[in-house]
Amino acid sequence: MNPYYLLVPVLLPMVTGAAVLGLRPKERRKREILVMGGILAASAVIGALVLNRPGQPLVLYRFGSRMNISLGLDGLSGVFACLIAVLWPLTALYSFEYMKHEGKENKFFGYFSITYGVVAGVALSHSLITLYFFYELMTLATLPLVMHAMDTRAIYAGKKYLLLSMAGAAMVFVSIISLHEYGTTLDFTWGGVIPQGLSHEERRHLYGAFILAFFGFGVKAAVVPFHSWLPAASVAPTPVSALLHAVAVVKGG
């Protein structure tokens, strides 16, 4: 399958989400068609990609010889992509009725769709740089959903979520620098990227980078001591809590 199809599950939900944000509040039918149509189309493309994997990754931009923004699909990313493709449409169906009582539906469904594209980007990342980009973009996309009610509890939960996510981002960034310094590439490759024959000092740096990456990415997985954002984020509408627990924690973390 053409590697350019990897862009569809990422960009299509983002475009439909942006379109939903521009609708008038009373255009419920049009909103539901846009949201469900974009999600189902993206999920169908994910299914097609899993059944007929592209022969090579799609490189979107290169930062020299060892860094790039690229998308790809292997066995593990296919599992996570299928998880998104199945869970998101079901949550959307539930949300259409649920959000009638919550208000600000355009805002909710706009960022709901955008988050689909961002999380699909996490699943389809073919390099550590790409994963980091979408991983941090997921924080920005889900923050308006966590703070949907905009009351005291929601604002507090949003601030905690943002601060812990920024702390995790900083730790991962430092670990990427170390891996770029001592590794062979930042692409996801079979057999790993750590060369043989590293000195004791270089190995110590990489051990530290691993610990930073573990806790940095562990923020989304609610790893102790960075777990407190998850129960606080339960003030968000129920569909958001479901996705945070079932998708963001399981897959993003």
Regions found by a protein language model. Give the residues of each.
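C-terminal ends of transmembrane helices
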Residues: 17-28, 89-101, 144-153, 221-234
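Hydrophobic residues within membrane-embedded alpha-helical segments of Major Facilitator Superfamily
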Residues: 12, 16, 41, 80, ...
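Transmembrane helix-loop-helix hairpins at membrane boundaries of multipass inner-membrane proteins
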Residues: 1-8, 18-110, 184-200
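Residue-level recognition of transmembrane alpha-helices
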Residues: 9-13, 35-38, 84, 112, ...
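Membrane-interface alpha-helices at helix entry/exit sites of multi-pass transporters
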Residues: 30-33, 157-160, 237-246
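Alpha-helical multi-pass transmembrane bundles of energy-transducing inner-membrane proteins
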Residues: 26-28, 107-201
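Structural signature of hydrophobic alpha-helical transmembrane segments
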Residues: 2-12, 75-85, 128-141, 205-219
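Juxtamembrane/interfacial segments at transmembrane-helix boundaries in multi-pass membrane proteins
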Residues: 52-69, 130, 137, 169-227, ...
